[in-house]
Amino acid sequence: GILPECKLVPEEISFVLSTRENRDGVYLTLQKLKNGKMFKNSDLSSKKVPFLIHGFISSATNKNYADMTRALLDKDDIMVISIDWRDGACSNEFALLKFIGYPKAVENTRAVGKYIADFSKILIQKYKVLLENIRLIGHSLGAQIAGFAGKEFQRFKLGKYPEIIGLDPAGPSFKKKDCPERICETDAHYVQILHTSSNLGTERTLGTVDFYINDGSNQPGCTYIIGETCSHTRAVKYLTECIRRECCLIGVPQSKNPQPVSKCTRNECVCVGLNAKEYPKKGSFYVPVEAKAPFCNNNGKII
């Protein structure tokens, strides 16, 4: 038929595995990993393993994820796993049909979440990766997938993921849903959400901390015509800059808005990014932002 299939075969989901030794990454499937000698003599117990999960009509090779992978590897000797579920995300469909496929892509998110939960279980049980070293980072539908992975993983009774970072979690089809059917603060010990678009994302609070960047909509520097898509993907770029630069974006508690960032202390404000959970404050934060990369609002201040 004419309708897009956006067909997802879990066994065919692939991923790009990148390390400092192999920055360009190796394309693998879970089957190859299980049968391969890849980690035969590697001790992975000290390795941090972030999973990156792309969104609708995207893929693991998208420049934004490649940039984030590079930033993560520059910072730390880790193993980055970028999940590629492009078929299920309608990325290979005919241009005009891609968008009609959205409900199908939404349907596929649970299966991808289950795949990631199974994958992390294998890493922990077979390759001795420590649960405390796993972190999920997902954008748009990928953020919803991270939530489903968190729910699935808890069924194994091995504990909870330490952290999920949801980058502008997809709003359409999820806005009115309750916890079991969307990303939720109980999906990991710490769930960090960046809100950057009110139409493609959601204004609803979802995590342990919710950062509303520029009030969570219409990002500066995004022009009117492609504004929504630009604002939506900005969440990925913001996190990449926060990986590159410590305390690049500082969040002010919503209750204190419009307090300037310069008045922030470590006890009341929180830095967006990999160290957010080191700060005591939880809840909703307002994050002013610049229009151009590196977007930082801290003027060199580190709290």
Curated annotation (Swiss-Prot):
Expressed by the venom gland. GO terms for biological process: lipid catabolic process. Pfam families: Lipase. Keywords: Allergen, Disulfide bond, Hydrolase, Lipid degradation, Lipid metabolism, Secreted. It is found in: Secreted. It comes from the Eukaryota. Its EC number is 3.1.1.32. One of its GO terms (cellular component) is extracellular space. GO terms for molecular function: phospholipase A1 activity; phospholipase A2 activity. It catalyses: a 1,2-diacyl-sn-glycero-3-phosphocholine + H2O = a 2-acyl-sn-glycero-3-phosphocholine + a fatty acid + H(+). Disulfide bonds join 6-90, 179-184, 247-271, 248-296, 264-269. The active site is at 140 (nucleophile), 168 (charge relay system), 232 (charge relay system). Catalyzes the hydrolysis of phosphatidylcholine with phospholipase A1 activity. May act as an allergen and induce hemolytic activity. Belongs to the AB hydrolase superfamily. Lipase family. This is Phospholipase A1 2. It comes from Dolichovespula maculata (Bald-faced hornet).
